[in-house]
């Protein structure tokens, strides 16, 4: 999982990326291509 300041650019890299908020953190998850996982640091 990558830790990035801005997730908007990561989300636009694949059309199946989802922006999810869990426990006060923001994540990008992708069920199809799992390598696009990221968390906002």
Curated annotation (Swiss-Prot):
This protein's GO CC annotations: ribonucleoprotein complex; ribosome
InterPro entries in UniProt: Ribosomal_bL36, Ribosomal_bL36_sp, Ribosomal_L36_bact
UniProt cross-references to Pfam families, sorted A to Z: Ribosomal_L36 (PF00444)
Keyword line: Ribonucleoprotein, Ribosomal protein
Coiled coil: none
Keyword Lyase set for record: no
Molecular function as annotated in GO: structural constituent of ribosome
GO biological process: translation
Domain of life: Bacteria
Family: Belongs to the bacterial ribosomal protein bL36 family.
PANTHER family per record: 50S RIBOSOMAL PROTEIN L36 2 (PTHR47781), LARGE RIBOSOMAL SUBUNIT PROTEIN BL36B (PTHR47781:SF1)
Protein name: Large ribosomal subunit protein bL36
Gene behind the chain: rpmJ
């Amino acid at each position: 999982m990558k830790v990035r300041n801005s997730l908007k650019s990561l989300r636009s890299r694949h059309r199946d990326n989802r922006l999810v908020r869990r426990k006060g953190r923001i994540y990008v998850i992708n069920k199809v291509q799992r390598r696009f996982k990221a968390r906002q640091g």
